[in-house]
Amino acid sequence: RSSVPVNTPIYVCHLSADRAWALVETSYTYGWIPVEDFASADNEFVKTWESGCYAVIIRDHTSILDEKGQFLVRASVGHVFPLAERLSDHLQMLIAVADRDRRAVIKWGFVSVDAAAEKPVRFNLVNAAKIANEMIGEPYGWGGLYGNRDCSSMTRDFFTVFGIWLPRHSEDQVKEAGAYIDLSGLSPEQKEKVILEKGVPYLSLLWRKGHVMLYIGSKDGRALIFHNIWGIRTKDLAGREGRKIIGQAVITTLQPGRELRDIDSAAGSLLDNIAAMNILVRANQEKPSP
């Protein structure tokens, strides 16, 4: 279903018969994990962890070090940790590690202010573009395979930086938050017109079945999207289906691959298949300021 970042709070629901696996829930998913991958937390730990003041990682593949400069954990954009103190050039954070009895204990972790910030980061177009630039080109990984992101984990991590919580599944992200706009009954031209007229750059999600995209603005009258995509569906003259692999986070129009001779016109066009838009504008903010 989904990978879970390091130091994510979980609830253990059940152990397998051999006690090697645990069925766990997080705030956004559930599934089985090896018991060696988590540590139990007592009430005192929980009280300390729920500090109410948090830091968020803003640079992918960031190493968090202890006070001696030794490696503790690796984190990426959107990963959240309790914030202890802001120093001149570093943030001091709480990091959970397991002791010999598999109990969670707290260590100090340090990370450069270039790689982490107090959560939430102020939303504006400059900050939004910076976070997108950190993610662009990152490999595609369905469900977090090999530690990479798929389309919905990319959008989820992106918005976490700005304090906007999203569900994990692409359809839920569009239907369970913000202002939902149904595009399913419109022609491709009408869809793009609505997106250009009503979409808020970096605050609007576009959705087709199985794929979610972030609207980021327009160029030459065409909508631009930022998304992590596996590939474009193709079909040759013999009717054989395939994929033109992209396999990373990219910026495209709503018709990537339209120049391909063998693009599957029915299933391969994002614009033709977009069914909805969701505008995630917070109540106290009409549009992001530069």
Name every feature range the model reports, one short phrase each:
Residues 1-20, 25-64, 71, 77, ...:
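Boundary regions of SH3-family modules and the immediately adjacent low-complexity/disordered segments
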Residues 8, 79, 201-204:
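Structural motif
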Residues 3, 167-236:
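...with weaker cross-activation on analogous glycine-rich loops/strands in unrelated enzymes
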Residues 28-31, 36-56, 62-65, 215-290:
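Aromatic- and glycine-rich peptidoglycan recognition patches
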Residues 2-5, 16, 73, 150, ...:
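Short, glycine/acidic-rich beta->alpha junctions
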Residues 41, 62-63, 67-108, 138-149, ...:
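Glycine-rich catalytic cores of cysteine/serine-nucleophile enzymes that process amide/ester linkages
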Residues 24, 154, 213:
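Terminal peptide-recognition signature
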Residues 82-185, 209, 226, 278-288:
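N-terminal capping segments
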